[in-house]
UniProtKB/Swiss-Prot annotation:
UniProt PTM comment: Monoubiquitinated by the BCR(KLHL12) E3 ubiquitin ligase complex, leading to regulate the size of COPII coats.
Keywords for the protein's UniProt record, in alphabetical order: Cytoplasm, Cytoplasmic vesicle, Endoplasmic reticulum, ER-Golgi transport, Membrane, Protein transport, Repeat, Transport, Ubl conjugation, WD repeat
A Pfam family that the UniProt record links to this protein: WD40
Biased composition (Polar residues): 814-826
CC annotations in GO: COPII vesicle coat; endoplasmic reticulum exit site; endoplasmic reticulum membrane; vesicle coat
UniProt keyword Transcription regulation, yes or no: no
Keyword Nucleotidyltransferase annotated: no
Subunit text: COPII is composed of at least 5 proteins: the SEC23/24 complex, the SEC13/31 complex and SAR1. SEC13 and SEC31 make a 2:2 tetramer that forms the edge element of the COPII outer coat. The tetramer self-assembles in multiple copies to form the complete polyhedral cage. Interacts (via WD 8) with SEC13. Interacts with SEC31A.
Function of the protein: As a component of the coat protein complex II (COPII), may function in vesicle budding and cargo export from the endoplasmic reticulum.
Protein name, UniProt field: Protein transport protein Sec31B
């Protein structure tokens, strides 16, 4: 964009790079005339001040010249003196060469003209000063004259070559080499460039264009490479720029053709050797990147030709352009808005016409919008490369680099770059507290640690929390919890004794034991009988006197018609139930309780319930809870003002198994229904229950803004509570949840950022398999370097993928049925899906001896459970067809672990390894097909039909057969492999039954078919046409077809149709209780998302998810999922309940990456979609 402008029909020259301030010299051009048609010449100097927002240049000096100028150069000769600003050399008409002292021009003092020579015969159009020796000046004119002047002695110049050796033509340009100070080149209109060696005073090479249409208008040497130069052509027929290398001077290295008309000027940037600036007759100024031959900057000049462009030596982003319309403009290649220039022009005009007041705004009609911005260079130039840089590295490291500064008068030399690595620590208090925690955990002195924390706490809630944490480390924790809540037996004993004026023992259980009443009665009866068995029998009168004391008043049994009489009759008849009813009706509750106790446990329980329901007092609800032991009602219905009393009840009465759950319920209710203060107090409930995960979640609700010290407070409590749980359950009984893992990972990252790598690694959970923890542990281990030598490296936290491994191969297999021909079936390209079900326990499908074609095995196959007794009957199998088995099967359904091949989980195995088992299809004449889908296999074990038995012979190579896709997957079928353990041959003979033990060497025995079963007619419909009963069982199975090949000789009457099989219905099992929470979490998530979703697409996706998740529940009912998949799903459900969807997606990715695709493909993708939707909706 334009920075400055000057209206002068002149040639130009920049001040040297060492000159400050920056100047621009102009001399009246000999090729132009102004409006006055004056032929006088003028030399002017202007100061270039970019801090001035105006477009005008500041005039600093002027001098009348004897002639006009064709060329101006400004050199640093003599600038070593303090008062010198260099020398300006001008070339004029009639061979005139004039030297000016810049200092004298600026000061307007002494005579500025140093010398004036007229040696050339024509106009001097080419001038250049040597960059290494500032006193050497090269000048060129007509008749091929080139003189080398020594500014110290201008009397006798050096002449290059002789006129006889050179044809007489003008010198268009001269340029000194930028690397070799004795090399000079000249450009001629004929299209050639001559390179001179001043040491030999002769040309060493001539470069010319073979087309003879190249009219050179300028040349420039490469700033860094001594043997390269560019030539530009002013011919409109060939407006090109040629890049030559003198080492390969037969043809140019590059030819650039960006201009549409002849090129007038060229300038090579000394700050960035890849930038070449040119101006041409097409009114454009272009800047090219010579490395890529791309135009990186384009500036239109509004239909004016620029005959001279020059880079600024001091500011590399600025260049000047002198045009034939009489203007010299300064531009920047870094880009700038046009609006700035327009505003400046408008302000300038307004200031000229205004009378002390601003002009009114002008309503300008809307014009065609122009480009408001001139884009900068497409490629960042070399001069804006950072001289220094800084970057943070893992572990709190700060990496810096820099280049040593070089004085301006010295040539930069290559030097090694220095890189500094320093340790940055910003949280000293955080590190100190972390070290104290680690020391307390290592020494085991956590009681004193908790005591100190309690004393240092400023808030009462924090002090109480630390006291609770301390109690978790002590014995008899429940009684101490009660004491902290304000309930002590000793204090109560004193209060009751004061109230009753007597001592009351409170150490007994608040309830009598179940047999206390009966035992008391037996003891009383035995003691009464012992008196009469140890003494001799007395007289009859003495005996009755003892039984009935003489002074006892005889009592009567009421037989009246009032309530007492009815009670007497009921008791006399042993009807205790009606007697209790009468007592309750008359509100004689004590009598009712006594009678109910005599009537048994059920009657006593009913009486207590009716009493508690009828008698409503302030303490009746508490009595009901104590008597009925319904602690859940206490947690759910009590007032939150009495949360301390509710927690005290749980501490006193609740059993060990239910206590943690009830405490968590109370804490959750305090979080959801209580105030912020109650949310903070809920942490005490979680400490009592030992729920670290709930404690962390509660802390996250109370601390929205995370700071290092707040995280340190949390980790101190988490580590103390975790250590108390380890004392109770052992070191392997505590596994962190997603919220805890997330915060611990944050804490370890923060420690690592402060440089405490070993401390950070010590706080990570040892047995946690979550990816963030494993990745951080691996990174911390390797970041410590030699500090962990001798320690075992943690497992690699990322899945290993074998790139370029052959996943499948084409092989052949022989089937000896009659003539025993062999067939080859082409194998389609493998898909990243594999189905490896497990066969039924009652039917071993693989021999104990492996096939010689089985290759190495390195990874476990997914576990598919065999169907239970409720499974439907297996499909029949044609005689002579034996299913392929993926792994050996032991008696009783025990599974033999067979590793999968090395590679990405869920890919096809390597050649030779046992491939997934496909459910058998039906054989018909001339065909062999496996038309079953993998999903049907776990429900349908195999059973053969037809006479004959299978005999094993010499193993043969396997043959690939097409196998249909998984349900719901369109496309061509995949391939599977028939067994490689033997050759199947039908053999007539008696029908034997299948055995549960594996048959030796692959010989399989078969059950007899039912006598009433008749083989159907040959197949005329698709094989997978299921009966209505089977369609009801598997509604999602698509129809499948397969390409089949079979050897001849298979009898057609043995082919069976699937729809003629005796159907059996299978009832869907109920979801096991341990998985009910899984279903509840996912269904609740779907409901929340449906309520929050607004667009129709998301709602349809959620409806589809509800249907697809049924596949998951079905697999959970059947028990066909691998244990690690089930565990991962429960972990995802925990993340869903905690609202941590990002952590849930991380667990999902881990489970999906470590599982067989066919095992999880029906529900894992839609589960991921639901988690993403929930994360977006913030449910």
């Amino acid at each position: 964009m334009k920075l400055k402008e000057l209206e002068r029909p002149a040639v130009q020259a920049w001040s040297p790079a060492s000159q400050y301030p920056l100047y621009l010299a102009t001399g009246t051009s000999a090729q132009q005339l102004d409006s006055s048609f004056s032929t006088n010449g003028t030399l002017e100097i202007f100061e270039v001040d970019f801090r001035d927002p105006s477009l005008d240049l500041k005039h600093r000096g002027v001098l009348s010249a004897l002639s006009r100028f064709h060329k101006l150069v400004w050199g640093s000769f003599g600038s070593g003196l303090l008062e010198s600003s260099g020398v300006i050399v001008g070339g004029g008409d009639n061979g005139m060469l004039i030297l000016y002292n810049v200092t004298h021009i600026l000061s307007s003092g002494k005579e500025p003209v140093i010398a004036q020579k007229q040696k050339h015969t024509g106009a001097v159009r080419a001038l250049d000063l040597n960059p290494f020796q500032g006193n050497l000046l090269a000048s060129g004119a007509s008749d091929s004259e080139i003189f080398i002047w020594d500014l110290n002695n201008l009397n006798v110049p050096m002449t290059l070559g002789s006129k006889s050796q050179q044809p007489p033509e003008d010198i268009k340009a001269l340029s000194w080499n930028r690397q070799a100070q004795h090399i000079l080149s000249s450009a001629h209109p004929s299209g050639k460039a001559v390179v001179w060696d001043l040491r030999k005073n002769e040309p060493i090479i001539k470069v010319s264009d073979h087309s003879n249409r190249m009219h050179c208008s300028g040349l420039a040497w490469h700033p860094d490479i001594a043997t390269q130069l560019v030539l530009c052509s002013e011919d409109d027929r060939l407006p090109v720029i040629q890049l030559w290398d003198l080492r390969f001077a037969s043809s140019p290295l590059k030819v650039l053709e960006s201009h549409s008309r002849g090129i007038l000027s060229v300038s090579w940037s000394q700050a960035d050797a890849e930038l070449l600036l040119t101006s041409a007759k097409d009114s454009q100024i272009l800047c090219r990147n010579l490395g890529s031959s791309e135009v990186v900057y384009k500036l239109p000049t509004q239909s004016s030709w620029c005959f001279d462009v020059q880079w600024c030596p001091r500011d590399p982003s600025v260049f000047s352009a002198a045009s034939f319309n009489g203007w010299i403009s300064l531009y920047s290649v870094m880009g700038r808005s046009w609006e700035v220039q327009h505003m400046r022009q408008a302000d300038k005009i307004s200031s000229s016409f205004s009378k002390g007041q601003p002009l009114p705004p002008l309503q300008v009609p809307e014009q065609v919008a122009q480009a408001p911005l001139i884009p900068p260079l497409k490629k960042p130039p070399k001069w804006i490369r950072r001289p220094t840089g800084v970057s943070f590295a893992f572990g709190g490291k700060l990496v810096t680099f820099g280049l040593p500064s070089t004085p301006a008068h010295l040539v930069p030399q290559p030097c090694p770059r220095l890189v500094f690595i320093s340790q940055v620590t910003t949280e000293s208090e955080f590190l100190m507290r972390s070290a104290e925690l680690q020391e307390a955990l290592g020494s085991g002195n956590l009681l004193n640690y908790c005591q100190n924390k309690s004393q240092q706490a400023l808030l009462q809630s924090e002090k109480m929390l630390w006291q609770f944490l301390k109690v978790t480390l002590e014995q008899d924790s429940r009684m101490k919890f009660l004491k902290l809540l304000g309930y002590s037996k000793d204090e109560l004993q004193k209060k009751v004794a004061t109230w009753l004026k007597s001592d009351v023992g409170l150490g007994e259980s608040p309830q009598p034991k179940g047999n206390d009443l009966n035992s008391d009665r037996q003891q009383a009866f035995c003691s009464q009988a012992s008196k009469h068995t140890t003494k001799e029998a007395s007289a009859s009168s003495a005996f009755f006197d003892e039984l009935v004391p003489q002074n006892m008043t005889p009592w009567e049994i009421p037989i009246t018609k009032d309530i007492d009489g009815l009670l007497s009759q009921a008791l006399l008849l042993g009807e205790l139930g009606p007697a209790v009813e009468l007592c309750l009706k008359e509100e004689r509750f004590a009598d009712a309780i006594i009678l109910a106790q005599a009537g048994g446990t059920d009657l006593l329980k009913q009486t207590q319930e009716r009493y508690l329901a009828k008698k409503k007092t302030k303490i009746s609800s508490l009595l009901a809870c104590v008597v009925q032991k319904n602690w859940k009602d206490v947690v759910c219905t009590c007032s939150l003002k009495n949360w301390r009393e509710a927690l005290a009840l749980l501490l006193t009465y609740s059993g060990t198994e239910k206590f943690p759950e009830l405490c968590d319920m109370l804490g959750t209710r305090m979080e959801q229904e209580g105030s912020r203060a109650l949310t903070s107090e809920a942490r005490l409930c979680y400490v009592c229950s030992g729920s670290v995960e709930r404690l962390v979640e509660c802390w996250a609700k109370c601390h929205q803004a995370l700071s290092p010290m707040a995280l340190q407070d949390l980790m101190e409590k988490v580590m103390v509570l975790n250590r108390s749980l380890e004392q109770l359950r052992g070191p392997h009984g505590v596994s962190p949840g997603p919220a805890t893992t997330y915060r611990v990972t944050q804490y370890a990252n923060l420690l690592a950022a402060q440089g405490s790598l070993a401390t950070a690694m010590s706080f990570l959970p040892r047995d946690c398999a979550q990816p963030p923890v494993q990745q951080l542990r691996d990174r911390l281990f390797h970041a410590q370097g030699s500090a962990v030598l001798g320690q075992q490296s943690p497992p690699f936290p990322f899945p290993r993928i074998v790139v370029g491994a052959t996943l499948h191969s084409k092989e052949t297999s022989s089937y000896r049925l009659g003539s025993q021909p062999s067939h080859q079936v082409p194998t389609p390209s493998p898909r990243p899906r594999v189905f490896t079900p497990q066969s039924s326990p009652a039917m071993p499908l693989a021999p104990s001896h492996p096939s010689p074609y089985q290759g190495p095995r390195t990874q476990n196959i997914s576990d598919y459970r065999a169907p239970g007794p409720q499974a439907i009957q297996p499909l029949p199998l044609s005689p002579g067809v034996r299913p392929a088995s993926s792994q050996p099967q032991l008696l009783g359904g025990q599974r033999v672990q067979v590793p999968n091949p090395v590679g990405f989980p869920g890919t096809w195995p390597l050649p030779g390894s046992p491939l997934p088992m496909a459910c058998p299809g039906i054989m018909r004449p001339g065909s062999t097909s496996l038309p079953e889908t993998p999903r049907l296999f776990p429900l349908l074990p195999l059973r053969p039909l037809g006479p004959g038995r299978m005999v094993s012979h010499t193993p043969a190579p396997p043959a690939s057969f097409p196998v249909p896709y998984l349900p719901g997957d369109p496309g061509a079928p995949c391939s599977s492999v028939l067994p490689t353990t033997g050759i199947l041959t039908p053999h007539p003979g008696p029908q034997d039954s299948w055995k549960e033990a594996p048959a030796p060497r692959g010989n399989l025995q078969r059950n007899k078919l039912p006598e009433t079963f008749m083989p159907p007619a040959p197949i005329t419909a698709p094989v997978m046409s299921l009966t209505p009963e089977l369609q009801g069982i598997l509604p999602s199975q698509p129809p499948v077809s397969s390409v089949s090949h079979a050897p001849p000789g298979v009898p057609g009457e043995l082919s069976l149709q699937l729809q003629h099989l005796p159907p059996e219905k299978m009832e869907r099992k109920e979801l096991p209780p341990e998985h009910q929470s899984l279903k509840s979490s996912f269904e609740a998530l779907l409901q929340r998302c449906s309520l929050s979703a607004t667009d129709l697409k998301t709602k349809r996706k959620l409806e589809e998810a509800a249907q697809r998740l049924e596949y998951l529940y079905e697999k959970l009912c059947e028990g066909t999922l691998s244990p690690h998949v089930v565990a991962g799903l429960h972990e995802v459900a925990r993340c869903v309940d905690a609202g941590s969807f990002e952590q849930g997606l991380a667990v999902h990715a881990q489970v999906a990456g470590c599982s067989s695709f066919s095992e999880v493909s029906s529900f894992m993708p839609i589960l991921k979609a639901v988690l993403i939707i929930a994360h977006k909706l913030l449910v």
